[in-house]
Regions:
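Charged, glycine-enriched surface loops/patches
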Residues: 86-121
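Extracytoplasmic ligand-binding site segments that recognize negatively charged/polar headgroups
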Residues: 100-113, 147-172
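A short, structured surface patch at a secondary-structure boundary
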Residues: 20-70, 74, 79
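Stable alpha-helical elements in mature extracytoplasmic
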Residues: 25-28, 63, 81-85, 107-110, ...
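Short, structured coil segments at secondary-structure junctions
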Residues: 32-33, 92-93, 176
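Alpha-helical, coiled-coil/dimerization segments enriched in small aliphatic residues
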Residues: 42-46, 161-188
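Bacterial Sec-exported substrate-binding components of ABC uptake systems
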Residues: 1-24, 122-153
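Solvent-exposed loop/turn segments at secondary-structure junctions
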Residues: 24-27, 42-45, 81-83, 102-106, ...
C-alpha cells in the first residue's frame, strides 16, 4: 500500500507494466526513472522515448479496449479525468491510482509516490532536491524586485480564459510572489 495526500492505494509491489493516462503524470514517472507502457495522445512535443509509447486517446477520452489489451499491472491517471474508468478497471482486477492533483503543491508528494511505486526512492529524492533548489534560485533572483502584477491567459480554439491561483501556471506565479490581477479582481 502507498499513500498520496491522505489517500491509500493498494498497488503491486514491483509493477512492470504501468499504464499512464495523463502525460503530466507520465513526465513525473519518467523523471524518477520509471517506465510506462502507454501515454495519452497529444499535439505537444514529447521526448522520443515517450513518443514511442502506444497512445490511448486523448486524456479525457481513453480507449479502454486498447488499455485493457496492454495488460497493465497498475494504471495511473487523474481523478478528475479518469474516475469514469475506475469500475471497469476494478472488474478487470487492475489496480488504479487516480491522483487528485491540486496544482504544483502536489508535485513533491507525487514524485515521492512515484519513486516508492517504482522502487526508485533515491532518484525521486534527487529530483525533488533539484526541483526545490531551482525554485529557491528563482525566488532568490527576484526577491529584490517589485512584485509584478500579471494575468495568466489561456487561449484555445474555443476562446480565452483567465487563470485563477488554482490553475498550474497561475499557482507558479503566486509561488514567486507575483500578484494575479484576476484573483485580486475576484476578491475585490
Amino acid at each position: 500500500e502507498l499513500t498520496f495526500n491522505g489517500e491509500t492505494y493498494t498497488v503491486p509491489k514491483n509493477p512492470q507494466r504501468i499504464a499512464v493516462l495523463s502525460n503530466s503524470v507520465l513526465s513525473m514517472l519518467y523523471a524518477v526513472d520509471g517506465k510506462a507502457v502507454s501515454r495519452a495522445s497529444t499535439t505537444d512535443k514529447l521526448a522520443t522515448e515517450l513518443e514511442a509509447l502506444p497512445a490511448l486517446g486523448q486524456t479525457a477520452n481513453i480507449n479502454m479496449e486498447q488499455l485493457l489489451g496492454l495488460k497493465p499491472d497498475v494504471v495511473l491517471g487523474l481523478e478528475n479525468q479518469h474516475k469514469k474508468y475506475e469500475s471497469q478497471l476494478q472488474s478487470n482486477n487492475i489496480p488504479a491510482v487516480l491522483f487528485n492533483y491540486d496544482g504544483i503543491k502536489d508535485n513533491v508528494p507525487m514524485l515521492t509516490f512515484l519513486g516508492e511505486l517504482t522502487n526508485h526512492q533515491d532518484k525521486a529524492k534527487s529530483v525533488i532536491a533539484t526541483y526545490e533548489s531551482n525554485i529557491q534560485k528563482v525566488k532568490d533572483a527576484i526577491k529584490n524586485q517589485q512584485p509584478a502584477r500579471i494575468a495568466v491567459l489561456r487561449a484555445t480554439g474555443k476562446g480565452v480564459t483567465a487563470e485563477t491561483d488554482e490553475a498550474v501556471t497561475a499557482s507558479m506565479v503566486k509561488e514567486l510572489g507575483m500578484t494575479n490581477v484576476v484573483t485580486s479582481h475576484l476578491d475585490g
